[in-house]
Amino acid sequence: MAKTIDFLASDGEDNFAARTISATSKPNRNDATASSSKPQKRARRSTKGSDDDGNDDFDIASSLLASAAEPAAVGMLSSSQQASQKAYASRVSAKDDDDDDARFIASVMQHANIKAGLEVAKKALSGKNKGKNKLGSGVVTGGGSFQSMGLHPSLLRSLLIRGFTTPTPIQRQAIPAIMSQPPRDVVGMARTGSGKTLAYLIPLINRLNGRHSPTFGIKSLILCPSRELAVQILRVGKEIARGWKADAGEGQDSRGEAIRWAIIVGGESLDEQFGIMSNNPDVVIATPGRMLHLTVEMNLDLKSVEYVVFDEADRLFEMGFAEQLEEMLLRLPPTRQTLLFSATLPKKLVEFTKAGLQANPKLVRLDADSKISADLRMAFFSVKPSEKEAALLVLLRDVIGVPLGEQAARDLDEEAQFNEDASDNQADGQRSRGYGNRRAEFKGKTKDKHLGNKRKRGGPGGALELLPHQTIIFCATKHHVEYLLLLLTTTGYACSHIYSSLDQATRGIQMSRFRRGQNSLLIVTDVAARGIDLPVLEHVVNFDFPPQPRTFVHRVGRTARAGRNGWAWSMCTNAELPYLCDLQLFLARPLVSSHTAIAALANGRDVASADALGLHDSLILGTLPREALDLETEFISSSLTNTSSSTAHDFPALRAVADRAQQKYEKSIAKASQESHRRAKEMVKLGSIEQINIRTASGREGQVPEWTLAGSPLEEMAVHDVVKRPEVYGLNRANKADAVTSALGSDRMDDKVKRGTDNALKEADEAAKRAALLAKVNAFRPQETVFEIGIRGDATPLGALMRSRRQTMQVKTKRAEALEARKRAIEGGGDAMEDDEEVTKPKVAARNKGKKKATAGKADNDEAVVGDAMVDMEQADEADILAAFDTTKPSKAQVQREALTDSETDASESDRDAASARHTKRARTKKAAPTSYRDPNFYLSYEQQGSTSERGYSLNNARSHTDSFIQQASAVSFDLAGDDATLGTQSQRPNVTRWDSKKKNFIQATVGADNKKMIRTESGVRLPASFRSGRYEDWKREKRIDMPKTGEIESNNHRVHERSPPETSVMGLKRFRHTKLSAPKTAGVFGNRRPGQPKRQAAKDEVKSARQIQKDRELKEKRREKNARPSKSDTNRRAKRGAARRGRGGHGPRGASR
């Protein structure tokens, strides 16, 4: 502020300067900003700002501060209040001036970076610089490109070299918001594979200027939920920050030290991580648990953190990380910039208040409607719980076509050739299934043959023939992972496995083998569902269906990334159908059965020649072939257990463990909504044997129900179209045909392809006939029971009983059929049935009347009910009433609807007369019209539009909408203890005891009996005492290191203040040398000995002094009194005295033995 006043005073604005000083308030912020960007117009704008008429902006800070022009108001305040008010005004003005200065500096640097970035882009496009600086053809300029964001030229060059020419939508909106001044918190949401990692790494590197800061303290902190994700972020960040050239100042070198990165994850040695943190890293990528452990153990000062990122924020803020984040957030400074990124984020930012967001964060929420990639194709299979393993083997062998055995990874030359082929294929406008598409575009243009080997962005070392078959399998628990690992390894597949409690070194080895293509399958829990980029991955299998839609989005997000195609295969049991219905509501996509969809697509034509189903925008549910399932089930139950190998012993044990884990897993997961449970029950009921009997009785014997699930009699008729025709979808058979073509050549391939196509069609035809025959056999119901075989009439009581029972069941079956037909007519799903009923209504009425006369003496009431429901007393609908009574004039919408229906059905009803056709069309129009009472213009629903998706995104959806009212009320209620009843009495605690295995007895289980000691941190949070064990102090004493305080400057020689031993030390031990030069001393000093020879000691005097004799006597007396026995001399003296008495004829001593 003082600088601005001096500047204005030098320009002749003394009056305005004096008025500004007396007011002790800041100028208008807009004016200050503009003046800082255009210094030559400051005086003019300041004059304009001083006019009361021309200043339309209102400054809250200026209005709240007292002005010198108001003497009355100032006079009413005391001197201390006036002083405090002036001090507050000065602080506000200083802060605003700092913000204006920072904004001005940022704008100047941004303009300079944009200008320099354009030069970098031009050089790259024109090809003036050869080698690494040369880029492929493409447009890299424009409003949405990276160089228009004001990035540093070195960072822009690094992005362009690696093929990142155009930012993704999330990067285009998030990066400018993050880099704005003053810094603003950002909450970003975009689907998986959309580039969220670069959206926060690019501003991070640009903010650190690509160089290491000599000031001690962490500058940026990135928190992520899993270790693999942390390693991936570290690899991407180091790659982007490589090759940075800093701006050289006066007397400085442009080649400074690169950014120091640190990764802090669990499973690693604490001593190594102590050394990493003492190395003063700039960026720390960590998991919350281990980072909190180091923070408490080392007592880290996090006040220097300016940039905090919560990657996969919805997972971080769930219950598992509440304690870790609470303590860490209290240690972070309030002036930090906080970023939250995830693929599934709720719209309500109230759920993220723990992150300490500022008052006005920016929400960037993209792809909220699509949620998953448009290149992802999904297939859902209905399976029995006991046949899940068999279904997995059928899927891997017959559909995906995963090869058996461990595959050898390609060498670097073959990989480079493959990347060049992939880049050439992209010229046709198609996205290759090879990895590293962006990298391949630039890689083929460079002359550096080793450049591509350094950056394997799509996954290092993937083998060419393994790319279409790399598959990741998601399971519920680690016990399922171990069980499937044994099963698939025994079957012959090369598998890797990862779960949370696995050792970190083993996890790295397993992931590396899968990335290099040696293993075809990766069996994991949900620990690998977050953020891990596996570009070679094309197939994702959900062995256990995810209970939450958010989990499904993250699982299938591992494939179909960066424009590549991908497949998601999900197995669903009848118990998991409600979760599938919840997923359908969350994705807002239709859920249809495979046989219904393919029949509608064929439209009366041959099913084999129909087009492929739209698996991108629909959820298609089908079954698997029964023959293949039976073969695999027999293999698992017999072949694996009836051997003498160790597998036969381990397999049943692991299966039992997995079954028990499944039971506990089902108890712990959230429940689906009540509406989804209702729909799931209806789906299961439609394929039951009772509904099949109803259809058979009504003359629809050959009709397949809409929903035919696994275990129903007609499941063979509902096999998924992907399994029946995999070549249509480019799966197993197409890959085999390509392999045969490459092996035999194009000349000999014509006959082979034709012969193979004929065989495939013949096999498909035979499979369809076999499925139809098996479906008829499964749906067969005999006309007679075992009590009626070979018996005529009512010869036996059991035969008469079954005959009467059958008549009663027929009545109930007809009643259920009528109810089902009416329900379909109301819901709009029975249009075809209504047409048939209109044509055959007279025949049905005549048949029912004949049945009434024949059975007049039996079940009159029941037949009357059936007749009432079907014919005699059928309730008239709205169309019949309107046809008989013209009560009101039809509305405009009704007239338009009738006209549209008339124009569509004229061709099909041209043979009828005009009056009859008009009446029929009017009635059909009224029946087909929606019967809902909701007017879209005025109806207010009890739910907000899009509430289903928001419930799926919600973090606490386990108790928000899935539970009943009683459960929700119990979660938020609390009880108060009655004071009157126990007033004046001592409350007794229950006698809770537990068995101690060491003491072999029951002991009292009191507080602290579990031996879990807690400590309270400075912020008041209680943490386990193991977080402060003193290992860091021991490590400092062992390494002889003194950690600098936050904000201090590093020393030139050492990164930390290390008390290093002398240079001549050996193995850390001190070694001193004689370096002092002085004259030797005379020999008289040492006597006859040499220098360094020890002194000769005199002989020990053996004559005791009186004091020593007295001490020895005292010690001897103490020993005698302690022993309580007479000494040996006393015993001898007593014996001699007795002998003398016996010699003189006297008696011995009293009590002596004779």
UniProtKB/Swiss-Prot annotation:
Instruction: List keywords of the entry alphabetically.
Output: ATP-binding, Helicase, Hydrolase, Nucleotide-binding, Nucleus, Ribosome biogenesis, RNA-binding, rRNA processing
**Which parts of the sequence form the motif Q motif?**
144-172
Which Pfam family is an annotated match for this chain, by its short name? Helicase_C
Q: Read off the PROSITE patterns from this record.
A: DEAD_ATP_HELICASE, HELICASE_ATP_BIND_1, HELICASE_CTER, Q_MOTIF
> Do you know which InterPro entries this protein is assigned to?
DBP10_C (IPR012541), DDX54/DBP10_DEAD-box_helicase (IPR033517), DEAD/DEAH_box_helicase_dom (IPR011545), DEAD_box_RNA_helicase (IPR050079), Helicase_ATP-bd (IPR014001), Helicase_C-like (IPR001650), P-loop_NTPase (IPR027417), RNA-helicase_DEAD-box_CS (IPR000629)
* Residues noted as binding ATP in the record, renumbered to the chain: 190-197
Q: Where is the composition biased (Basic residues)?
A: 844-855, 918-927, 1134-1154
State the reactions this protein catalyses: ATP + H2O = ADP + phosphate + H(+)
Annotated region described as Disordered, given as residue ranges = 16-58, 417-462, 826-859, 885-939, 1043-1154
Cellular component, GO, one term:
nucleolus
* Biased composition, class Polar residues, residue ranges: 21-38
GO annotation (BP), single: rRNA processing
List, as start-end ranges, the regions of compositional bias called Basic and acidic residues: 438-451, 1043-1061, 1098-1133
Gene3D superfamilies attached here? P-loop containing nucleotide triphosphate hydrolases
Domain Helicase C-terminal residue range list: 446-602
Q: Which SMART domains match?
A: DBP10CT, DEXDc, HELICc
Q: Which domain of life is it from?
A: Eukaryota
Name the predominant localization. nucleus
Q: What is its EC number?
A: 3.6.4.13
Q: Name one GO molecular function term.
A: RNA helicase activity
Sorted alphabetically, which PANTHER family does this protein's record hold?
ATP-DEPENDENT RNA HELICASE RHLE-RELATED, RNA HELICASE
> What remark about domains does the record contain?
The Q motif is unique to and characteristic of the DEAD box family of RNA helicases and controls ATP binding and hydrolysis.
The text of the family note is: Belongs to the DEAD box helicase family. DDX54/DBP10 subfamily.
The name on file for this protein is ATP-dependent RNA helicase DBP10
The gene is: DBP10
